[in-house]
Amino acid sequence: SVVSVKNLINKAIEWGHKAVAITDHGVVQAFPDAMNASKGKDIKVIYGVEAYLVDDDLDIVQNPNERDFNQRFVVFDIETTGFSVTGDNITEIGAVLLEDGQIKDRFSTFVNPRMDIPYEVQELTNITNDMVEDAPPIEEALKKFMDFARDSILVAHNADFDTGFIAQKCSQVGLDYKHEKIDTLLLARVLMPDMKRFGLDRLAKALAINLSGHHRAVNDAEATAQIFLRFISMMKKDGVEKLSDINKVYGKIDHTKLRPSHATIYAQNYLGLRHLYELISDSHLNHFYRQPLMRKSLVKQKREGLI
């Protein structure tokens, strides 16, 4: 912060606040100043941290079945008006059906988002308001996509984003969503460990796969399908025959290669403050990779006294 802790606390007192929370970013450097500035004054300091949280117990594939790679996979991509699953809407869905290790069918539709597409998103995706004006609404487009994806495992690059949108919109329009998912981004991290960045365009280039019209769902889905087929061949060479073999052969994801999430954690009492110090010390001493990475498993162990 550009504001000194002393001035911050004095201003909080001036405004009549009874408590103020201090959340340093990954560190506790402001804690001593906060303690000294609040000593003898009618205000409580709540000590906390904005942590770089990583899931160090993450399987590559969640809840894998025992079937081989000849089963149905629907590799898909979406374009949206923004990043919020609740505040933004889908503008395009593109998908490729894989079965018996081959491309069997394709699906593509624009979606009327019932809102203006921000200018910067139009520049990125080349999808304009005019292009979606007469497109089917989400209720119609999503039903067609879910029919296309029936009895299939969904595959996407950075799958949490795409499946998060699909699941939320299914809930919104009253459609069932019970699909398992595979993330080609996580697969890339174990199958192509020499790469430092795993964007779809970089991955396609590294594998000599054509990706024209990047950030259009139909094109990204096609490229992701080709990447996934290539990954299947690579995994088979490593002895992976069934979906459930992936976690057995490759183990857990290296959490230092995951993008951390920001989590705000507060100490509720003295025990919580001690646990907070232990978590922060561990992140700096044992798991520093570009940032002090706080492990989710350790947070669970030190959960008492924290909110």
Go through each PLM region and give its residues.
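Conserved catalytic alpha/beta cores of large enzymes that bind or transform nucleotide phosphates
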Residues: I138
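Phosphodiester-processing cores and adjacent nucleic acid-binding clamps
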Residues: S1-T80, T86-N89, V96-I103, F107, ...
